[in-house]
Amino acid sequence: LMHTLWPRTQALNFKFSWFPSPLYLDYDERLAAGRPRTRYAIDDYEGMTFWLALTVEQALPKRLQTRWPDWLGFAVGYSARGMHGANVKSRGREREYPELPSAHPEILLSLDYDARYMPAGGWLWEEFKQQLNWLHFPAPAVRVYPDLRFYLLYL
């Protein structure tokens, strides 16, 4: 609705990325050792990152738009680590790990690719590209909180 009422807001999009965390990948080993774990990908919150992506070209003044690649943008990401129930406020089934550090957020800055600018095709391909644009693809990134860290490819 916001994009329809205010077309300039189309320069902002929400995106999602996921890369399996050790809580998910090492489930069997963690289960045997009695350590925090998650069985299902949908519950692997440590592996998820949520992004607010800016389509830079749409946000630039008209005279500068020709100098910026259509498909390249920036994104701000939010993720969390330590989501294993160690926090005192945790009510989850894994709350019995008080010796582990509490969860903490991570803030990232990254390049972003706009899938809508992939080569043209038929109507089905065009619809597919629109759906791909909900995903944040691996790209260089910098974690700015809680500390500074560079990722050649943030998955």
Regions found by a protein language model. Give the residues of each.
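Hydrophobic alpha-helical membrane segments
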Residues: 1-155
